[in-house]
Amino acid sequence: MSYQPNKVLEVFDNPKIERDFIIQINMPEFTCLCPKTGQPDFATLHFAYIADKACIELKSLKMYIWLYRNEGAFHEAVTNQILDDLVQVSNPRFIRLKAIFNIRGGVYTTIITEHKQKNWTPKAKVDL
Protein backbone atom coordinates (compact mmCIF):
# COMPACT_ATOMS: atom_id res chain seq x y z
CA MET A 1 0.00 0.00 0.00
CA SER A 2 1.43 3.35 -1.07
CA TYR A 3 0.85 6.50 0.92
CA GLN A 4 1.20 9.97 -0.53
CA PRO A 5 1.81 13.28 1.23
CA ASN A 6 -1.52 14.90 2.02
CA LYS A 7 -2.55 18.28 3.45
CA VAL A 8 -5.73 16.78 4.97
CA LEU A 9 -5.46 16.39 8.73
CA GLU A 10 -8.00 14.02 10.24
CA VAL A 11 -9.37 13.86 13.78
CA PHE A 12 -11.43 11.48 15.86
CA ASP A 13 -13.67 12.00 18.89
CA ASN A 14 -11.88 12.47 22.20
CA PRO A 15 -12.69 9.30 24.18
CA LYS A 16 -12.46 11.12 27.57
CA ILE A 17 -13.63 14.65 26.89
CA GLU A 18 -14.25 15.30 30.60
CA ARG A 19 -10.57 14.72 31.46
CA ASP A 20 -7.53 16.87 30.71
CA PHE A 21 -4.94 14.33 29.62
CA ILE A 22 -1.73 15.05 27.75
CA ILE A 23 -1.04 13.50 24.36
CA GLN A 24 2.62 13.56 23.36
CA ILE A 25 3.78 12.83 19.82
CA ASN A 26 7.41 12.80 18.69
CA MET A 27 8.37 12.83 15.02
CA PRO A 28 12.15 12.53 14.52
CA GLU A 29 12.14 12.63 10.71
CA PHE A 30 10.74 16.04 9.74
CA THR A 31 12.29 17.49 6.59
CA CYS A 32 11.79 20.73 4.70
CA LEU A 33 13.97 22.73 2.33
CA CYS A 34 15.92 25.87 3.13
CA PRO A 35 14.23 28.63 1.09
CA LYS A 36 17.61 30.33 0.52
CA THR A 37 19.76 27.37 -0.58
CA GLY A 38 17.32 24.57 -1.41
CA GLN A 39 19.26 22.28 0.92
CA PRO A 40 17.29 19.94 3.19
CA ASP A 41 16.70 20.91 6.82
CA PHE A 42 15.98 18.14 9.32
CA ALA A 43 14.18 18.43 12.65
CA THR A 44 12.58 16.45 15.41
CA LEU A 45 9.05 17.63 16.18
CA HIS A 46 7.68 17.28 19.72
CA PHE A 47 3.94 17.81 20.09
CA ALA A 48 2.14 17.97 23.44
CA TYR A 49 -1.55 18.74 23.55
CA ILE A 50 -4.71 18.47 25.60
CA ALA A 51 -7.59 17.64 23.31
CA ASP A 52 -11.01 19.20 23.60
CA LYS A 53 -13.59 17.43 21.43
CA ALA A 54 -11.17 15.97 18.88
CA CYS A 55 -7.86 14.11 18.86
CA ILE A 56 -5.43 14.23 15.95
CA GLU A 57 -5.28 11.04 13.88
CA LEU A 58 -1.64 9.94 13.65
CA LYS A 59 -1.47 8.55 10.12
CA SER A 60 -2.94 11.74 8.68
CA LEU A 61 -0.43 13.75 10.75
CA LYS A 62 2.40 11.66 9.32
CA MET A 63 1.19 12.23 5.74
CA TYR A 64 0.69 15.95 6.43
CA ILE A 65 4.23 16.32 7.86
CA TRP A 66 5.62 14.38 4.90
CA LEU A 67 4.19 17.07 2.60
CA TYR A 68 6.88 19.53 3.74
CA ARG A 69 9.77 17.43 2.35
CA ASN A 70 9.77 19.35 -0.93
CA GLU A 71 8.70 22.76 0.35
CA GLY A 72 10.98 25.67 1.09
CA ALA A 73 10.28 27.19 4.48
CA PHE A 74 12.02 29.14 7.20
CA HIS A 75 12.09 27.24 10.51
CA GLU A 76 9.97 29.84 12.28
CA ALA A 77 7.33 29.93 9.54
CA VAL A 78 6.95 26.18 9.08
CA THR A 79 6.71 25.50 12.83
CA ASN A 80 3.98 28.10 13.27
CA GLN A 81 2.12 26.92 10.14
CA ILE A 82 2.02 23.35 11.44
CA LEU A 83 0.68 24.56 14.78
CA ASP A 84 -1.94 26.77 13.09
CA ASP A 85 -3.15 23.88 10.93
CA LEU A 86 -3.45 21.56 13.93
CA VAL A 87 -5.38 24.18 15.91
CA GLN A 88 -7.71 24.79 12.97
CA VAL A 89 -8.63 21.13 12.57
CA SER A 90 -8.74 20.00 16.23
CA ASN A 91 -9.22 23.14 18.40
CA PRO A 92 -7.32 21.65 21.36
CA ARG A 93 -7.56 23.09 24.86
CA PHE A 94 -3.79 23.51 24.72
CA ILE A 95 -1.07 22.58 22.25
CA ARG A 96 2.68 23.14 22.15
CA LEU A 97 5.00 22.34 19.28
CA LYS A 98 8.75 22.23 19.79
CA ALA A 99 10.80 21.86 16.60
CA ILE A 100 14.47 21.03 17.16
CA PHE A 101 16.34 21.52 13.90
CA ASN A 102 19.64 19.77 13.24
CA ILE A 103 22.81 21.81 13.15
CA ARG A 104 23.33 23.84 9.98
CA GLY A 105 26.38 26.06 9.48
CA GLY A 106 27.33 25.64 13.13
CA VAL A 107 23.92 26.85 14.34
CA TYR A 108 21.19 24.92 16.14
CA THR A 109 17.65 26.28 15.92
CA THR A 110 14.79 25.36 18.25
CA ILE A 111 11.35 26.87 17.72
CA ILE A 112 8.67 26.56 20.43
CA THR A 113 5.15 27.76 19.73
CA GLU A 114 1.88 27.15 21.55
CA HIS A 115 -1.83 27.87 21.59
CA LYS A 116 -4.37 27.86 24.44
CA GLN A 117 -8.14 28.19 24.25
CA LYS A 118 -9.26 31.54 25.69
CA ASN A 119 -11.36 30.23 28.59
CA TRP A 120 -9.38 27.09 29.39
CA THR A 121 -7.34 26.95 32.60
CA PRO A 122 -5.08 23.99 33.34
CA LYS A 123 -5.79 21.93 36.40
CA ALA A 124 -3.24 22.03 39.21
CA LYS A 125 -0.24 19.81 38.46
CA VAL A 126 0.34 16.90 40.83
CA ASP A 127 3.91 15.63 41.22
CA LEU A 128 4.13 12.18 42.76
UniProtKB/Swiss-Prot annotation:
Cross-referenced SUPFAM superfamilies: Tetrahydrobiopterin biosynthesis enzymes-like
Record-level GO BP terms: queuosine biosynthetic process; tRNA modification
The keyword Glycosyltransferase is annotated on this UniProt entry: no
Name of the gene: queF
EC category: oxidoreductase
Cross-referenced Pfam families: QueF
Active site as annotated: 34, 41
Name the UniProt record assigns to this protein: NADPH-dependent 7-cyano-7-deazaguanine reductase
Protein family per UniProt: Belongs to the GTP cyclohydrolase I family. QueF type 1 subfamily.
GO molecular function: preQ1 synthase activity
Record function comment: Catalyzes the NADPH-dependent reduction of 7-cyano-7-deazaguanine (preQ0) to 7-aminomethyl-7-deazaguanine (preQ1).
